[in-house]
Amino acid sequence: MKFIDEARIEVIAGDGGDGSASMRREKFVPFGGPDGGDGGRGGNVYAIADRNINTLIDYRYAKKHLARNGENGRGSDCYGKGGDDVTLRMPVGTVVTDMDTGELIADLTEHGQQVMLAQGGAGGLGNLHFKSSTNRAPRQKTDGKPGERRMLRLELKVLADVGLLGMPNAGKSTFISSVSNAKPKIADYPFTTLAPNLGVVRVGPSKSFVIADIPGLIEGAAEGAGLGHQFLRHLQRTGVLLHLVDLAPFDENVDPVAEARAIVGELRKYDEALYEKPRWLVLNKLDMVPEDEREARVADFLARFEWDGPVFEISALTGQGCEALCYAIYDYLAEHSDAHRAAEEEDLATDVRFRDAPPADGGATPGDDA
């Protein structure tokens, strides 16, 4: 199936039905009074996150989604039927934004999460509501309210723990296929990967994390070179980025340091917050470097790149160093997940302490002796 990560749609909620202005007309019941029922409410439009869907392709071609109108009220106190709701199933990770106001309407991060996109109009009132001691036969009734109408932008940001960065042919697809069950297309030409790929890396019976491979970046991607940097949005939810560098390029004129700096520059142009994410340097294709040259080549790269963060030396093709890298990633994610959970618990405990704290001025509380 074709991978689509962006779409624009129009959602139209149903209009409310009109109220009825009817009088009770029945044998042996003179002056029966008003019996007009209310109109039904208009149908709502909802979005629900579904983990079994992984693309927005359904919304690339189906642009308009309408809910049904509510039925009009009728006599004999008959209320109109409410309009049927419409539920749009979207991939987990979809962000829904109002195109006219820029308002963030929904960020679907959990399976089954449901959000209202457009609310149906309220039904009108029948003349039954306007009866009074001075107006026994009212003819007033109200019309139903129109439903909401919105133009929405849908963006899919895949949910992954780890994101892969690198130039085309840096070995990202080979790496993800080596450490997970993902089967991306792998070839010896640039831009083999045209859409994000996800793989689950298992380091134990109940220990795993998700890794995302996106199409490669090149210098000038911010200006649209190559495939641009549109796929970088899929890395915004990750906990750590792996910057893969080809340490043994086939072209002797290619400088790995210059390519690595170009990737960092494009990352910063796209999003400062993404640039500030934890980033690990992964030097790949060491199997192509003679053993007696490896240490010197790695040291030269790190000195010129001026890198003082975590460094891992691997060969995605042979698997050398990949297992140690995966265990380090899992330990890092587990540690920071525990730290984040502890911080949330501390915030909650602090909030409880403040709620239960005595008055700051030391004044008497109700019930204290004067």
From Swiss-Prot:
Q: Does the keyword Nucleotide-binding apply?
A: yes
What are the BP-aspect GO terms? ribosome biogenesis
| Subcellular localization | Cytoplasm
The record's region (Disordered) falls at 344-370
| Keyword annotations of the record | Cytoplasm, GTP-binding, Hydrolase, Magnesium, Metal-binding, Nucleotide-binding
> Where in this chain does the record put each Obg domain?
1-159
Q: Which Pfam families does the UniProt entry name for this protein?
A: GTP1_OBG, MMR_HSR1
Q: Which residues form the OBG-type G domain?
A: 160-334
Q: Which cysteines are joined by disulfide bonds?
A: none
Matches recorded under SUPFAM superfamilies:
Obg GTP-binding protein N-terminal domain, P-loop containing nucleoside triphosphate hydrolases
Reading the lineage from the top rank, the first entry is: Bacteria
Q: Which residues bind GTP?
A: 166-173, 191-195, 213-216, 284-287, 315-317
Required co-factor(s) are:
Mg(2+)
Assigned EC number = 3.6.5.-
Tell whether Kinase is among the UniProt keywords.
Answer: no
Q: Which GO terms describe its molecular function?
A: GTP binding; GTPase activity; magnesium ion binding
Q: Which family does it belong to?
A: Belongs to the TRAFAC class OBG-HflX-like GTPase superfamily. OBG GTPase family.
Which HAMAP family does the record match to this protein?
GTPase_Obg
The protein in question is named GTPase Obg
Q: Its gene?
A: obg
